[in-house]
Regions:
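Loop/turn elements at helix/coil->beta-strand transitions in domains of secreted/extracellular proteins
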Residues: 9-14, 50-55, 103-109, 127-130, ...
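Short, surface-exposed beta-strand/loop micro-motifs that present aromatic residues
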Residues: 98, 196-198, 410-416, 420-422, ...
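Short, well-structured beta-strand/strand-turn elements
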Residues: 105-117, 372-381
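Active-site segment of extracytoplasmic enzymes that catalyze sulfate/phosphate-ester chemistry
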Residues: 15, 23-110, 119-120, 124-132, ...
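Active-site environment of divalent metal-dependent phosphoester hydrolases
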Residues: 116-120, 315
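Bacterial Sec-dependent signal peptides at the C-terminal "C-region" and cleavage site
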Residues: 1-9
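Short active-site alpha-helical segment characteristic of glycosyltransferases
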Residues: 97, 113, 364, 385
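Active-site-proximal cap/lid insertion segments
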Residues: 18-38, 46, 55, 85, ...
Length: 497
């Protein structure tokens, strides 16, 4: 692919990734839920107004680890066997966005969550980042960030289940522990980002990738300043007593798996769960505002590309709202794989646009390379968004086909134009509704159909009417597309490096 000329000065790049953000939880959307309209997401609204919001953008998987590796490589992570949890990992042989930008003279930093799910080889410093502050696990506690918190858990839990609890100090660079008391990850990560933007990078442009853990579980750990804003009651914390009350996991009351089955799958509903979620969303939005303000104060905003996205769809266990989309994280329903993407660069790209073009998080790698003046690798599955962003004729039809696959059980999905074919993608779980602002369980579970399902997403975006019997030729066509795609992918499994 040819390099697109954009001028001599390389832009700075800031990528901000939310965790499990509900598709509808942005207040600039016409159909945003009432509670979002009330609290607002003013800084994400501002970013969208300064750029382009994509309403038909997709993650490469409905879960964290595979989706994150698909984004950072611009490729289907299934090419090296990363379909689902337990199959994860990012080979060091894969070219990533920061690796490619370093070759163009960029300084690079990663802040926040990593979760490439493959051990020490997945550390950010092994994949193109010069600096790192955050954690490499699937989750981390929002406020229990000190060695004292870790010790309290060890004492209360007698050493059990500590590997998955993810409590205690953060990590800086290659192993340095950062123990923080009276801290809140969203603010820690925001301050670190602002400090990096403000420092002297010499003649180097910078690439900053900030991955908030908001709004991933455990959202029930809330910064008290934000708790007050959404009407949550005070929840004092006694570190020495190590008293964890529902919905917090208590290691003395049984194993993590049993707790997660109950809480994580809504076997027991947290009435205040949505308010907890909203408090974290408010904190993240404030952080994004501080980052935008810092860029402006330093005279960098016009020449800085800001990208905002979520890793995957919103999840029911943190009470995210996916609006009219069916399904949640973990599912191949639109609510599991469709995500918001916002792209903004005042000096180079149009502002105040909303696009319904079908795009993917994989497209961000080639887009960044084009704007940085680099050559786009030929083996990427993503396509540059510049023709779409600049309203060029070639951008009217971006991706003809996108594919998702669980790697087992014949569970896969193909989107081709207006059509979506789902094969053995069924999912059933508990559900809830809101009464007087609190979550309550409902008798009927949420069900996404199994078997062969064909949906016309233009006429039926909620995926309610199966048209497979009426359009057997379309079912056959999309099945062939999946077969051809799968033949290019690896078998499920961990990479050798």
């Amino acid at each position: 692919m040819a390099t697109i000329s954009i001028g001599a000065e390389k832009p700075n790049v800031v990528v901000i990734m939310a965790d499990d953000l509900g598709y509808a939880d942005l207040s600039f959307l016409d159909d945003a839920p009432a509670d979002i309209k009330k609290i607002g997401t003013p800084n994400l609204d501002r970013l969208a107004n300064e750029g382009t919001y994509f309403s038909a953008s997709y993650a490469t998987a409905p879960i964290c680890s595979p989706a994150r590796t698909g984004f950072i490589t611009g490729r289907y992570q299934t090419r090296w066997g990363n379909y689902w949890y337990g199959q994860g990992g990012l080979p060091t042989s894969e070219l990533t966005i920061p690796k490619a930008l370093k070759k163009l003279g960029y300084a690079t930093k990663k802040i926040g969550k990593t979760h490439h799910n493959g051990g020490k080889a997945q550390h950010p410093l092994k994949h193109g980042f010069d600096e790192f502050l955050g954690f490499i696990h699937h989750t981390w506690d929002y406020t229990r960030l000190s060695s004292k918190d870790r010790d309290a858990y060890k004492k209360a839990g007698k050493g059990k289940s500590l590997g998955i609890l993810c409590v205690g100090p953060l990590e800086r660079n290659n192993g340095e522990k950062v123990s923080l008391e009276d801290a809140f990850t969203t603010e820690v990560f925001t301050d670190e980002a602002c400090a990096y933007i403000s420092q002297d990078h010499g003649d180097k442009p910078f690439y900053l990738q900030l991955a908030y853990n908001a709004m991933h579980m455990p959202t029930y750990v809330v910064d008290q300043d934000y708790a007050k804003k959404v009407g949550l009651p005070p929840e004092p914390w006694d570190r020495e007593a190590a008293s964890w009350t529902f919905p917090y996991f208590d290691p003395r009351n049984g194993p993590w798996a049993a707790w997660h089955k109950q809480w994580g799958h809504l076997g027991k509903v947290d009435p205040l769960g949505r308010k907890r979620y909203l408090s974290h969303l408010m904190a993240m939005d404030d952080g994004i505002g501080k980052i935008m303000d810092t860029l402006k104060a330093k005279g960098l905003r016009d020449n800085t590309l800001i990208v905002f996205l979520s890793d995957n769809g919103g999840t029911i266990n943190t009470y995210a709202n996916n609006g009219s989309l069916r399904g949640y994280k973990y599912m191949f329903g639109e609510g599991g794989i469709r995500i918001p993407i916002i792209v903004s660069m005042p000096s180079k790209l149009p502002a105040n646009q909303q696009k319904s073009t079908i795009v993917s998080s994989m497209d961000l790698f080639p887009t960044i390379m084009n704007l940085a003046g680099g050559k786009v690798p030929e083996n990427l599955d993503g396509k540059s968004l510049l023709p779409v962003l600049r309203n060029q004729p070639s951008g009217q039809r971006h991706h003809d086909t996108l594919v998702w696959d669980k790697g087992k059980g014949g569970c896969w999905v193909v989107r081709h134009g207006k059509w979506k074919l789902a094969h053995n993608a069924g999912w059933t779980h508990s559900d809830y509704e809101f009464k007087n602002g609190e979550a309550v369980a409902v008798d009927a579970p949420f069900t996404y159909p199994d078997g062969i399902q064909l949906f016309d997403l233009e006429d039926d975006p909620r995926e309610t009417t199966n048209l497979a019997d009426q359009h057997p030729e379309t079912v056959a066509e999309l099945t062939k597309l999946h077969t051809a795609w799968r033949s290019q992918m690896s078998k499920p499994g961990r990479p050798k490096n």
